Amino acid sequence: MPALPPVYTPSGAPSSVHAPPAVPPVPVPTQPLRSEYQTSNDACIKRLEELNIAPAAKLYPTPTEPGKCGVEAEIQTNVFGIEMHQDSLFYQYSVNITTELKNGKEVTFTKKGKDDFVVTERHDKCCAILFRALGDYEEFFKTSDSCLIYDGQSILFSNVDLFQGFREGAVKTKYMQLDGGEMDHKDLKSLPCIKLEVFPTKNPAVKFTREAVARRATDSNLDSVSLAYQQILELALTQPCLRNTARYVVFDHGKMFFIDPLGEGFEKCDVVDVGDGKQVVPGLKKTINFIEGPYGRGRSNPSVVIDGMKVAFHKNQPILDKLKEITTQPVEHGLKGLEKDRCAAVIKGLDCYSTYGGRERHHKIEGIHHEGARNARFELNDGGSCTVAQYFEDVYNITLRYPDTNLIVSKERGNINFYPMELLKISSHQRVQIPQLTSAQSQKTTKESAVLPDVRQRLILTGKNAAQISSDNEVLGKMGVSVCEDPLMVKGRSIPAVKLANAEIGANPINVKDNKWRANRFTRPATAPNVWAMYVVGTASTRITLDTLKKFADEFAAMCKSKGVNMPAPADISLIHMDAIESRLYDATKANCTFVFIITDDSITTLHQRYKMIEKDTKMIVQDMKLSKALSVINAGKRLTLENVINKTNVKLGGSNYVFVDAKKQLDSHLIIGVGISAPPAGTKYAMENKGVLNPNVIGYAYNAQHNQEFSGDFVLNSASQDTLAPIEDIVMHSLNEYQKFHDGGLPRRVIVYRTGTSEGNHGSIMAYEIPLARAAMRDFSPDIQLVYIVVSKDHSFRFFKPDLASLASRPQATSSTASRHSAMPAAPKAWDLNIAPGILVDSIVTNPACKQFFLNSHITLQGTAKTPLYTVLADDAKVSMTALEDITYKLCHLHQIVGLPTSLPTPLYVANEYAKRGRNLWNEAVALNNVPTVSGPEADRLKELTKSICYKASGDLTGRRVNA
């Protein structure tokens, strides 16, 4: 018997046969729910049809001249120009590779996969088969004369018509057979007949010329844009790596990694063991972008953007060794309870393999069984039963060294199988997924991956050379294409610092130094609550006295008063056990309490979202702080920590801490709306199938209806299957209603929307289906309101560096404050020393020539390398100049209110993202409490009803204040 038979509990099985472990936390239903929408834009399309509105053209607004504000600044990029030296014509073909196993089952190698191991294994085999065929069938492929570009799966491009000479009307399909025994790939040796099929696609031949690339790759009408140029160039750059799977691992979206990083020129510090059987290794992400180039507006030039990265992979090691790195408990004696569950979470979903049956067999890990091979039993074909350990002794002559170690659970062809852990190894080339990370692991991995700019530049250049993105690439040579050796230098601009004050006209200016500031008195102190309370929430082991809490309360109230909030003494101040805090909060509500300040023991991580649910339900503001932070205020005198806490208090209570100087009244008659999205975590799609709805997207939004520079908002639920946002109509309508409420019925002259949560590939759909719904909402108020619609993205590969980075990285900084008096050493440069400063702007050369676009780095980078947001204008009724658009966007990045630093995103968008997160947490809390109503009807109506059950709109005045500060 080649593999361990299924171990399960059939009808009539003896009680000693154990069932598999508990099902996953979010099971797929027997007949799974499906979204009623067939495409990712159906909700918007359906609503447009109801309104009798035609979709808009997928047409970018006309680009305008670059902005003029600021002083010129030299910026180093990670963009490498691509030069085309000859014209070509490329034909596209489909590739299908199959074989038949001994049991008669057909295997398709070119079938797409999702898991890392499946993807890389199929790439490996497909490449081995196709490149063998290039030699065996040289006459058909015209191998010596043609330039062949393969994607490692089912797409092949050739600059020669492979079917030239076939008679008219003939079936243009080439069937080939290959013997796996003649190939070098060990997994193919046992396959005597591998079938390869090549046939033309319906796509026309691609005219690969400079003129065609410039015209078809970057047309402002997206329906005229051909993605084939981008695809061909991307695959051409990847060919050396795809063809040499012993050196490279290639994934989708331009990501690649190196089997032997040190042998490819990387340094030892680039490969870091982060524990739990995981290792951070260097890699690249490359994307083809068509940019304006150095010769001004109206030009289009191909380029490759290369970003270095460090990503955690699971080590190729025995599972037993991996678990020994995860837990301190003796794995050989068996894991139980929470420790077993913790280890299972780290390895769930991984591919592993065994060799005890005489050949390599792969298994996908579902979990860890609660028993080991010594005790776990299963039925034999003769009706008897035996232990797993005895079975391996009898059938494979294997005496297990660790029979008490938990069995590994694997699901194969619908059966649940159990395997001895000591006989399994983790397969190579598997990236660590978020659910496989503990909190501590996540922090450590993030720290190792967040490299400083000088290190990132080294990773980029080392990786570029190792991946042969250069003249060494034989395929590029055949195409007549070359990649520039050096990255582009561009002329950006540095925008002047934003002036902050206690009033928009500039009264009581705030001192801004190095893009940092501290406000004294608040611009608009909140009205202090008449009745409020302060509690410490802890356990029996929490160490804080009531006197210490009272001291903190005194300092809290005193600083509030110094900033203009006349906080009375708390009506109730107590130490509360975590089990009693919910009832105490509801009691506080009954006593007319409107604000509760809670200090929670750091070890308690389950209550914060419960506080927020109670806050929404009772309209009583609840602010939460970690105990360690509070003690640092009392014991270490950390006044800045307390100041930031009180900044948050003032905003939560409806106040404003500071504003930027707006003497020209740029925001007058402007409604600014931010729209952010929280997508459901992986694996939670069916969290609420019993309620008639799939786990939704949560769309947060924020607007400045009440005061020009203050943003509050709410959230709505939307189908997770939709890339465009049908609720944008309701969002714009609600925001305009709120604006009218605080402007005596008046309407704004202009609505500016900052929208995130999308990629460049969705721009056309947003312009065609989403923006018309926003306009429809505006027309219900007035046809004269202008719309400016901007999408903001950090999901790109562009990086910007200081031009003198090498000298800065080697230059000692000011002496570290932690150094002793006698051994003071210059401190190493920090992230903020090496990264580009706030206010750096790039709106030419590396931008898309078809649209109005700019990069704006508005924040101080505290860790790693700056990720500069990209702003793309999708609607511009006002024809706003780039100067004005960039200026107001930068100013809006200075209204965070809590800490005295600019943010990476404009405040309306930052706050909208926070509302999306809050909405997700409230949704999860409602699901956990089974507090979600069962709904029926069309999906859009169901989601609206569910939104009403958890959003802030139903909580009265909470939408008028930024409760998620």
UniProtKB/Swiss-Prot annotation:
Residues 318-428 form the PAZ domain. Residues 10-20 have a biased composition (Low complexity). It is found in: Cytoplasm, Perinuclear region; Cytoplasmic granule; Cytoplasm. Expressed in the hermaphrodite germline and in oocytes. Expressed at a low level in the male germline. Not expressed in the soma of hermaphrodites or males. InterPro entries: PAZ_dom, PAZ_dom_sf, Piwi, RNaseH-like_sf, RNaseH_sf. GO terms for cellular component: cytoplasm; cytoplasmic ribonucleoprotein granule; nucleus; perinuclear region of cytoplasm; RISC complex. GO terms for biological process: regulation of gene silencing by regulatory ncRNA; regulatory ncRNA-mediated heterochromatin formation; regulatory ncRNA-mediated post-transcriptional gene silencing. Residues 21-30 have a biased composition (Pro residues). GO terms for molecular function: miRNA binding; RNA endonuclease activity; single-stranded RNA binding. Pfam families: PAZ, Piwi. Its main location: cytoplasm. Residues 594-924 form the Piwi domain. SMART domains: PAZ (SM00949), Piwi (SM00950). Argonaute protein which is involved in the endogenous small interfering RNA (endo-siRNA) pathway and is required for RNA-mediated gene silencing (RNAi) in the germline. Interacts with secondary 22G-RNAs, which are RNA-dependent RNA polymerase-derived endo-siRNAs, typically 22 nucleotides in length with a 5'guanosine residue. Also interacts with the mRNA targets of 22G-RNAs. Associates with znfx-1 to mediate small RNA-directed transgenerational epigenetic inheritance of both germline- and soma-expressed genes. Members of the WAGO (worm-specific argonaute) subfamily lack conserved metal-binding residues found in other argonaute proteins and probably do not cleave target mRNAs directly. Belongs to the argonaute family. WAGO subfamily. This is Argonaute protein wago-4. It comes from Caenorhabditis elegans. The lineage of its organism: Eukaryota, Metazoa, Ecdysozoa, Nematoda, Chromadorea.
